Amino acid sequence: MYSAFNAGVNAFTRSLAVELGRDGVRVNAIAPDLADTLQTPADAMLRGRDPGMVRHWLPLGRFGQPDDYADVVVFLASDLSRFVTGVVVPVDGGTTAASGWYLRTDGRGWTNLPDQP
């Protein structure tokens, strides 16, 4: 269900951008990932794992903060993005770029097993 919803948001964003572009309306979306918030606290996401592992799981080494997402929204709503429409911006600390690969705990390369050195 989650994947279907995401695909729907992506398609809807592109479709609206095409439909409304001629009227000067830009339509974009963000795709947030792991965020340390009151609704999804880091402790709950860690589920008892060592907090130091976060630097291995996420290329930027930390969970997102609300301001990380808000700043992208402000950019998309500003004239700085006046030629940007129909895109979904991943705000994910690099998890999309890593595609499921994690820095090994010994620092010697990458693994697809996040808890293994």
Model-derived regions: residue spans:
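Rossmann-fold NAD(P)H-dependent dehydrogenase/reductase core
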Residues: M1
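Active-site helix of classical SDR
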Residues: F5, T13
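A glycine/serine/threonine-rich, flexible loop-to-helix segment
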Residues: R22, L34-L58, A98-P117
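Short phosphate-binding/catalytic loops that engage adenosine nucleotides
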Residues: V25
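Proline-glycine-enriched beta-turn/loop adjacent to the NAD(P) cofactor-binding site
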Residues: N28, P32-L38, V87, G94
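C-terminal helical subdomain
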Residues: A29, G48-L80, V84, V91-G93, ...
